[in-house]
A protein has these predicted regions:
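Alpha-helical assembly-interface signal, strongest on the long, hydrophobic N-terminal helix that forms
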Residues: 2-81
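Long, compositionally biased low-complexity segments
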Residues: 70-440
């Protein structure tokens, strides 16, 4: 029995030339999109590899600098070293070169200044006491006034010392004190003053530095100086601090004086404090009628044997200046002992009697040293003097101390870089891009 065969209907297949062309174009478009996306993805991967490698290279910051001074730097970072480290961290099959770089010493230490201020703002929350704020506000005018007062005192001492009798004459005593080493007058134990010193000629503030090419940066506001000083007082020690041995014992004094030795810097700071105190003390004497009367009485006594008319008033003025100078020496003594001295004196905080001025600096001196709880201590006066210094000098001298303590070259420390990278992708496609990294 024959099986019946079922016929399957056949269809005729055909496509127009237009449709075929359209289909080819669609395939080409999809292929181009896929290729473009693939190339862009490869670019993104290369750029991500570069960013990651650059961040990893700068993650090799100097740990000792961070631990001691809370400053981030990449030490000894030449393009050769940077290229090697970036290859190690995966930025391979590319060429890199530095477009711009910034070093810690650039722009007179502005890079260091920015990091120090940022640290103080984030972690210290420094706020000046009323006494320190008053000192910072009036210290410039005090120093200007002191220059005039000092000139007046020198003139009057030169004029009147020869004509007045030596016996019972405080002006002769003050003339002798001004020619005496200040440290021996204000320190209870001059032999215990540190004699440590450094060689300043090879330090950043004096030598020719390697310079980056990032260019100038925007300077901070006036309030940032308070934060810089807060950073300094936390990371650098002064006479009244006790820490492990460093290149210099009196680091804050070096920031103010800039001399190679501790002794020279301490003497310079004592002179500056003496200047501020003398102007303030003289200003107070001009308001105290009782003390002016005392000076006038002594002036009459000293001038009783002279026949020069009008000299009594001149001698009185000289005695007031000399008295202010003697009181200022006592003030500095009090500060070096760790006690406090008020910015503005009163009759209750005045320490040196005019009758005892002649004995100052001798074994017979009689001085009532007063610790004023509401005043400023030595650190407070140093902080006020630091506020008067320009930030460039403070920054560069801070870098001097960092180099001396850590034995590194701060102008070889990189803090910011912009690199240009060139990558060759498949089919000869090239990609050039830049990457920037900065410690923040």
């Amino acid at each position: 029995m024959k099986k019946s065969q079922k016929k399957v209907p056949a269809f005729k297949g055909e496509i127009t030339a237009f449709l075929a062309l359209l289909f080819v174009l669609m395939i080409s478009l999809v292929g181009a999109l896929i290729e473009s996306a693939s190339i862009q993805m490869t670019k993104n991967i290369k750029r991500a590899d570069t960013v990651l490698a650059l961040e990893s290279a700068f993650a090799e910051y100097d740990k000792e600098m961070l631990e001691e001074y809370d400053i981030f730097v990449r030490k000894g970072c030449s393009i050769e070293v940077l290229r090697q480290r970036m290859d190690y961290y995966g930025a391979t099959n590319m060429t890199h070169h530095i477009i711009r770089e910034e070093r810690l010493t650039d722009n007179h230490g502005h890079t260091f200044y920015e990091q120090a201020v940022r640290y103080a703002k984030d972690w210290l929350g420094m706020e000046a006491s009323p006494e320190e704020a008053e000192f910072a506000l009036y210290s410039d005018s005090y120093l200007e006034e002191e220059e005039l007062v000092h000139m007046d005192l020198e003139e009057l001492l030169a004029q009147e010392e020869a004509s007045l009798p030596d016996e019972g004459n405080p002006l002769s005593t003050v003339s002798h004190l001004k020619n005496t080493n200040l440290i021996t007058l204000v320190s209870a134990n001059p032999e215990e003053i540190s004699n440590q010193s450094i060689t300043t000629e090879t330090l950043p503030s004096n030598r020719e530095l390697q310079v980056g090419n990032w260019g100038s940066r925007q300077t901070g506001g006036a309030a940032d100086k308070f934060f810089l000083v807060a950073y300094i007082t936390e990371h650098f020690r002064c006479l009244t601090d006790t820490e492990d041995s460093r290149a210099l014992c009196y680091e804050q004094e070096y920031l103010l004086g800039g001399y190679p030795s501790d002794r020279e810097n301490l003497e310079k700071v004592c002179e500056q404090i003496l200047s501020v105190r003398m102007a303030a003390n003289y200003a107070y004497l001009l308001t105290d009628t009782a003390k002016q009367a005392e000076a006038e009485a002594l002036s009459l006594t000293l001038c009783s044997m002279l026949t020069v008319p009008g000299i009594t008033e001149v001698v009185k003025h000289a005695l007031l200046l000399a008295w202010a100078y003697g009181e200022s020496i006592v003030d500095v003594r009090v500060l070096l002992k760790g006690n406090k001295v008020p910015a503005i004196k009163t009759s209750g905080t005045w320490q040196l009697q005019l009758a005892n001025l002649i004995k100052l600096g001798t074994d017979e001196e009689v001085v009532s040293e007063i610790d004023a709880p509401g005043g400023l201590d030595y650190q407070g006066y140093v902080r006020g003097l630091l506020l008067m210094k320009d930030k460039e000098r403070l920054s560069m001298r801070s870098l001097d101390l960092i180099e001396s303590n850590l034995q590194i070259k701060t102008d070889e420390c990189m803090t910011k870089v912009e690199i240009e990278s060139k990558a060759v992708l498949r089919r000869g496609v090239k990609d050039t891009f830049s990457t920037t990294y900065e410690y923040k």
